[in-house]
Amino acid sequence: MTYSVGNSGVMTEVIWEEGPSLQSPLLVVAFEGWFDAGECATGAIQWIVDQHDARRIARIDPEEFFDFQENRPHVDITADGERRIKWPSLDAHVIENDFPHDLVLLSGLEPRMRWRTFCDSVVEIAHDTKCEMVVTLGAMVAGIPHSRPAEVKGSAASAELARRLGLDRPSYQGPTGIIGTLHDALDSADLPVISLRVGVPHYVAGPPNPKG
C-alpha cells in the first residue's frame, strides 16, 4: 500500500492498493449524509459493487476527515475469535467490463472536516485512474409519493457539457454539502463532472429507501 503524491507535489490522503490500467473510466461518487436521502445514492453504488464483484483499489484515510467521537469505529469479532476495529470507510472500487467505459466507484461517509483537502484526494483518484468524467449521485427529500416512478434529474456546471448531454445548468443557491464543494474542485481541475439526483418521498427519507 502506498500514499499518493498529488500533482502539486503534496502528499494526499489516498492509500492505493493497486494502480489499475483502465479503459476510458468514469468515476461515480456518492456520500452518506446531507445529500443521500433514504441512502439512495450510496445504496446505488453499493448495489453495483455487490452485483459486479468489484474490487477495492484505494481508500481515503479517514483520520483527517472525521471526529471519531461523532463517527465512532466499530468493533467486530472475526470467525476465528479475533477482535478487529472497523474505521469509517471511504473506499474506491473498480469494475472492468466489456463496455466502452470501466467504472471507478467511490463512496462512504460525508467527511466532517477539512473538505478542501478531502476534495483534493478525490481529484487525485480521478487523475490517477485517468477518468474521463466524474458523475456524482445524490438524493433529496421531495413532495412525491412512493407510487410514482422515481425521477432522476441531471445538471452540469459546464455550459458545453450541459448542452452536449442535454442537461440543465445548476440553479441552487444556499448552503451546500460535500458534493457541491467537490463539483467546484473538479471544475477547477478541468475534470468534466455532472450531477444526477433523485427525489425521495419525505416519509421514507430516513431509513434505506428500496424504491430509490
Annotated model-derived regions:
Residues T2-G108:
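N-terminal short beta-loop-beta anion/metal-coordinating cradle
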Residues V29-A30, S107-G108, T136-L137, R197-G199:
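Short beta-strand segments
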Residues D36-G43, M113, T117, Q173, ...:
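Conserved active-site and cofactor/substrate-binding residues in soluble primary-metabolism enzymes
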Residues G43-I48, S121-E124, K211-G212:
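Short, solvent-exposed amphipathic alpha-helical segments in soluble enzyme
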Residues H101, L109-E160, L182:
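Internal, conserved structured core segments that host functional sites
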Residues G143-G212:
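Catalytic cores of processing enzymes, dominated by hydrolases/peptidases
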